[in-house]
């Protein structure tokens, strides 16, 4: 059945397609940056060019499916199906299958140099751990699946007029980013480790602290565990915390080039990943210097590939803490002649219902411009529930507002 498309050059066609083929078509077309109708057109064209019928495709359970094709193509395809002795349902199934075969899942683009993202703020309670975990999850999601992404409405509403999306509330289904991610729990309190359902490393055993102090008892890679959720495959790993990190500053105070202690410790494993995320403690001590040094811009590294991602809240005390942190970063830049990039500000736990303090503070963060706000994440129940369940947020509630906002953040800092 056909009916003219309002554009005049395409017509609507209605056929049948199994739900599995329809889903594969939707995902694969998105992965290749195509509209589904263009993929169907290409599949039909390829099918018509074959010298003989391909293998039959299982069409049991096929349901009504409509798309738009160039005027006349469907009639020609119908005639070809008749001449080849196959039904339209079988013909379109074969055409879609052919297109899927000749357009495999594209390989994930890997960064030229491992990205090192230092998630920081010396103020506790701003949600650094939740942002670290969520960002790592968003970066590691399945590249062969579509996930919902939307710019936070509070963020979008404050963008410059020229940058504002047509509908900031509209969801867009995009492929997962498929990055290989290492989360490093650099906070001796171990919140990141526990939130993801793992145990802290035992005192007296091996730990990141030992490796930073030059006293490692084995391979650092032996301490790394997998965050075992199907949507992340084997792409999301965790280096758990150990409470011996409370003594880290003392342990590395006399170490040669102590600011490079974290970099030396992670050197043996960083090459296995596309992104390394450091969940920093609420501290401005030597350990924070080591984290910032790890996130500096290395020789021949593009600006903005690595750096500091600062988590704040829409309230006054966050502004005071932000000033202390940026002073430390600027001191390191000056004292060690480092190139240290700011990846941006994340305003976390935002709730406009808290009134003028929240909304005016958000506006103040937006007005800074350098570093700019790269994400606004709401204060909603799903994150707390995920922590209670000891599961990653994006696996526990993949379509909740927080998950969607964090995916937008991951894409914003991956540009």
Regions found by a protein language model. Give the residues of each.
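Hydrophobic loop/turn residues within beta-sheet-rich immunoglobulin-like superfamily modules
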Residues: 18, 69-70
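N-terminus-biased targeting/localization segments
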Residues: 18, 24, 33-35, 43, ...
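P-loop NTP-binding core
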Residues: 2-13, 27, 37-38, 48-65, ...
């Amino acid at each position: 059945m056909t009916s003219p498309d309002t554009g005049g050059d395409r017509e609507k066609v209605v056929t049948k397609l199994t739900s599995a083929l329809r889903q594969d078509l939707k995902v694969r077309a998105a992965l290749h940056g195509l509209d589904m109708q263009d993929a169907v057109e290409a599949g039909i064209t390829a099918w018509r060019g074959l010298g003989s019928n391909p293998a039959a495709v299982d069409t049991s359970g096929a349901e009504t499916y409509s798309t738009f094709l160039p005027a006349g193509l469907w009639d020609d395809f119908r005639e070809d199906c008749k001449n080849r002795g196959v039904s339209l349902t079988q013909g379109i199934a074969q055409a879609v299958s052919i297109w899927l075969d000749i357009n495999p899942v594209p390989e994930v683009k890997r960064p030229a140099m491992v990205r090192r993202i230092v998630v920081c703020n010396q103020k506790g309670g701003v949600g650094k751990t939740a942002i670290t975990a969520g960002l790592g999850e968003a970066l590691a999601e399945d590249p062969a699946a579509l996930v919902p992404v939307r710019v936070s409405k509070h963020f979008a509403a404050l963008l410059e007029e020229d940058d504002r999306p047509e509908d900031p509330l509209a969801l867009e289904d995009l492929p997962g980013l498929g990055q290989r991610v290492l989360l490093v729990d650099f906070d001796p309190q171990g919140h990141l480790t526990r939130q993801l359902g793992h145990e802290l490393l035992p005192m007296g055993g091996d730990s990141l602290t030992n490796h930073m102090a030059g006293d490692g008892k084995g391979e650092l890679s032996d301490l790394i565990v997998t965050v075992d959720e199907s949507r992340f495959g084997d792409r999301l790993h965790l280096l758990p915390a150990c409470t011996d990190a409370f003594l880290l500053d003392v342990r590395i105070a006399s170490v040669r080039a102590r600011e490079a202690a974290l970099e030396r410790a992670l050197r043996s494993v960083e090459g296995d990943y596309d992104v390394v995320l450091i969940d920093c403690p609420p501290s401005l001590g030597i350990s924070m210097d080591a984290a910032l040094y790890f996130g500096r811009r290395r020789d021949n590294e593009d600006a903005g590939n690595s750096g500091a991602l600062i988590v704040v809240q829409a309230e006054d005390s966050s502004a005071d803490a932000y000033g202390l942190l940026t002073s430390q970063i600027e001191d390191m830049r000056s004292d060690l002649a480092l190139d240290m990039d700011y990846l941006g500000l994340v305003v976390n736990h935002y709730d406009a219902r808290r009134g003028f303090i929240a909304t005016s503070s958000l506006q103040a963060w937006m007005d800074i411009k350098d570093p700019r706000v790269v994400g606004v994440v709401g204060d909603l129940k799903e994150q707390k529930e995920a922590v209670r369940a000891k599961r990653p947020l994006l696996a526990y509630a993949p379509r909740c507002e927080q998950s969607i906002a964090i995916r937008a953040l991951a894409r914003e800092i991956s540009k």
